[in-house]
């Protein structure tokens, strides 16, 4: 199967969606498909080759299409960039033979629908404005990352059989020879004798990290809350505002497995105040956490309950920092039970390997485009 994967992102990027797209393309290739990735021609501070940056074992061509890099101008700048990129995609697609145009962006989907291309839309956020509803009603198939998202689209009138639920995944090979806890902490500059609760990912209220910062103040002195995931000027501001939190900064995606080895507890603080977080999301960090075999404390929201259960995680009340701090303390008091949950999570995560996900998607597409 020849797949053209289209994504309106900087590439490579330090953000999680870049890793998700790179790993999906790699897994399509490993499952026998011929893949080309189309992205906009945008500036990135990352000079490293995507294969090295993401730790890929399979190559695929990356085509960079014309747009104006106006995202930094704000909402209208992003709209301008998106429209121009979609037009570039349309012009290129008309000259390109492919079995599937696999898209992440509703603007691109909507424009490609105008000439009847075989389009699949992978939706992550429940887009349903003027463009999103037009796109969803006209694509042949949709891939979504949670059952909550599928329910959302079915309630909007999209036929359930045309929607595949394929949660995000993890590269299990990266966890086969990961660092020891001591070497991981030494490399990251973390105290060797501390009890470490670690969060990896973006920072913001929509990520639930406000709860993490407040919970850190409620932990005993021997417990350290560590954050990996921000750099530059924002990092210094965060260190000043939250001196009780240890901010490591941004680290390359390829280090993820080794970095998680530094933790005694991994924190997943999804907020219930945001519908994407509460019902739709499928965080990459979740599956990496599971593969690490480190005990997980997770916010009790429906999107995370789709993957984790009482055998694989400890739960805290969403948006409740006192409860988060209490559960973290309990994990250290119940080490044997915590280790058992970590083991169960690492066994369950094999169902979410990238290559398993890719095969599931290809099988789904083959019934429509073969």
Model regions and ranges:
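N-terminal strand-loop element at the rim of the active site
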Residues: 7-15, 27, 31-84, 92, ...
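Nucleotide-activated donor-binding/catalytic signature segment of Leloir-type glycosyltransferases, i.e.
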Residues: 235-260, 265
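Conserved acidic donor-binding segment of nucleotide-sugar-dependent glycosyltransferases
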Residues: 310, 314-321, 330-335
């Amino acid at each position: 199967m020849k797949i053209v994967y289209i994504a309106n992102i900087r590439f490579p990027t330090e953000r999680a969606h870049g890793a998700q797209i790179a790993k999906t393309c790699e897994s399509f290739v490993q499952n026998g498909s011929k893949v080309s990735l189309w992205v906009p021609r945008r500036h990135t501070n990352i000079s490293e080759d995507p294969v090295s940056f993401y730790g890929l074992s399979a190559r695929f061509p990356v085509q960079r299409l014309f747009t104006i890099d106006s995202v930094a101008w704000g909402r209208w700048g992003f709209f301008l960039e998106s429209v121009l990129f979609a037009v570039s995609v349309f012009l290129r697609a008309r000259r390109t033979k492919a079995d599937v145009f696999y898209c992440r962006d509703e603007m691109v989907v909507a424009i490609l629908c105008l000439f009847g291309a075989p389009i699949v839309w992978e939706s992550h956020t429940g887009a349903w404005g003027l463009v999103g509803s037009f796109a969803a009603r006209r694509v042949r198939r949709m891939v979504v990352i949670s059952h909550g998202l599928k329910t959302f689209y079915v309630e909007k009138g999209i036929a359930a059989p045309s929607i595949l639920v394929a949660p995000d995944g993890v590269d299990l090979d990266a966890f086969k020879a990961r660092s020891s806890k001591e070497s991981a902490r030494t490399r990251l500059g973390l105290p060797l004798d501390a009890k470490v609760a670690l969060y990896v990912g973006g920072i913001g209220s929509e990520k639930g990290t406000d709860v993490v910062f407040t919970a850190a103040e409620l932990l005993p002195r021997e417990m350290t809350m560590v954050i990996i995931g921000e750099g530059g000027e924002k990092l210094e501001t965060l260190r000043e505002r939250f001196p009780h939190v240890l901010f490591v900064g941004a680290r390359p995606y390829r280090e993820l497995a080794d970095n998680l080895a530094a933790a005694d507890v991994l924190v997943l603080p999804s907020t219930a105040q945001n519908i994407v977080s509460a019902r739709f999301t499928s965080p990459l960090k979740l599956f990496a956490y599971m593969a690490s075999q480190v005990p997980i404390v997770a916010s009790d929201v429906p999107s995370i309950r789709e993957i984790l259960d009482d055998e694989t995680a400890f739960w805290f009340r969403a948006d409740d920092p006192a409860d988060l701090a209490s559960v973290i303390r309990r994990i250290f008091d119940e080490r044997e039970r915590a280790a058992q949950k970590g083991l169960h999570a690492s066994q369950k995560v094999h169902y979410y390997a990238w290559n398993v996900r890719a095969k599931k998607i290809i099988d789904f597409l083959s019934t429509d485009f073969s």
